[in-house]
Amino acid sequence: MSRLAENLRLTRPAARLPHTSRFSLKFLHAATLLLALLCALPATPLHANEIQVSSTRVWPAPDYTRVTIESPQAIRHTLFTLDNPQRLVLDLEGVALNTALNELAGKINATDPYVKGVRAGRFKPGVVRLVFDLKTQVKPEAFTLAPIAGYGHRLVLDVYPLTPPDPLLAFLNRREAGGNEPPAAPTAAEPAAAPPSAVTPATPPVALKPEATLPSKPAARPPRPGNERLIIVAIDPGHGGEDPGAIGRAGTQEKHITLSISQKLKERIDAEPNMRAVLTRTGDYFIPLHMRVEKARRAKADLFISVHADAFIKPSANGSSVFALSERGATSVAARWLAKRENDADLIGGVNIGVKDPHLRQTLLDLSQTATINDSLKVGKSVLQQMGGVNRLHKNHVEQAGFAVLKAPDIPSILIETAFISNPDEERKLRDPEHQNRLADAIVNGIKAYFAKNPPLAPAQVANSP
């Protein structure tokens, strides 16, 4: 029996595992399956919640360089400068270091007067750092803009020189000191090439030239009588930079048309023996409305002309118009609509409302403007009559509305709508260089006719005989 019992003991099933051991095996099996499922899923980015910058743009100008960073959400940022060498640091919080930021370095132009280059990198977790290498000491400003007119959230960096350039004032000082030769005019005109149809350009065209001042006297210019002084005309090409203005159906941007026509107008005014012209902008960059007026005042301008090619709700709207400032409201619904649209240029182009500018308060004050408005209506009528020989007139009289850019209390000012870029036929005309020449001829003839009947009274500081 003992041997049988021993055999039974050797052949019986193994003892069962304890309950806790069986649970551990099941848990291990489930964990293995879960790990396999996780490995099969697509990888999730480590910084999935970071803001993706959609585009970057750089707008170099004689007065300042603007860098725009556009994104679907507002970006928190920190700005400071470093010395030895001169650098500007912009830290972006919660932003991904993506292609748009890495491409920023390639958008800095060698002719930029203030920025030499830029480097982008991950400074620490959650912070992307942009380091701008500078050519001079600067006074930077950074501010944000809410979405408007097809743009998303924008972080705007304006790089101003520590000592602002003022070529117009420098010219005045040279004249007071006895220097007779005005600075040379730009040698090449900027073409009005067909712009992209999108509101936001990928890489803005860069064509930096010195800020336009009074041009050199042409060799064949006849002498002026001793008591006749120069008549200074400030020409303001509407829009520019971040603000494309109206856009035609073929993709033509107003800012390019206005600059091209203004340059042609300047050439014709400078060819007159008793006239000189200054441009508020000479390239594709943005200037706030009040600074356009301030540039004209610094030049001691006798006349301010803002050139536009606007749009209306209906594409059938057509014809040329001339506007002057109104103290009592707009003279028509269209005039009110156009004035609101032009006055919104600062919102689209981007103005730092956090900076208290004394010039802004000064130029937007409606002082005693009755006499100035009367002169504006006179010159506007003269120009409108001449333009009627080139294009159909939208209205046969000068309209009035509250255009902010016309609020210089001491300079007769008009705003010219050369045509409606929203009208396909007129858009084609506006793109035609010959039609632009005819418009410029008509405008300068209207200016000459006005000053022939209304010569400027007080001698201008800038008008000593050359």
Segments predicted by a language model, with ranges:
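Short, low-complexity intrinsically disordered segments enriched in A/P/G/S/L with frequent Arg
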Residues: 2, 13-18
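Bacterial N-terminal signal peptides
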Residues: 26-42
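Flexible glycine-/small-residue-rich
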Residues: 71-73, 92-94, 134-136, 158-161, ...
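Short, solvent-exposed loop/turn elements at domain surfaces
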Residues: 78-79, 99-100, 242-246, 424
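Catalytic-core regions of hydrolytic enzymes
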Residues: 196-358, 369-381, 428, 437, ...
